[in-house]
Amino acid sequence: MQGFDQKFRDLPDYILKITYQIWEDKDVESIREYYAKGIPVRSPAGVVYGPDAVVKATYATLEEFPDRQLLGEDVIWIGNEHDGYLSSHRILTRATHLNDGVYGKATGKNLIYRVIADCACKDNQVYDEWLVRDQGAIVRQLNFC
């Protein structure tokens, strides 16, 4: 893939490897390498801009769920080297609510839920992302409803 690091075979390999590096390897600072300056990351909670905001949110999530795993189930994609690529990454997430945070006081409960991350990528960077997390599954497993 022109413009991407040689270690990536294709776009699914890129998406899966950077996700693993950020979350399983806990290399949160690598977001600054892989996310473009000014990137919008959209979710039902709102929009954040730039790698600094993504790094901050990632650290906050890892503080609340330090054992969080993002198990990539599938990446569908389209695109080319000239125009860039679009991906949709289906993820199964496992985590334990070990510390206080956005979901309240730590419960110690084990969670399993799904996430969809849709990314636009070019030249070894994600430059636009839509992120949807199954909040309903999370709150049900935490007994909030």
Role assignments for model-derived ranges:
Residues 1-145:
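C-terminal and inter-domain tail/linker signature
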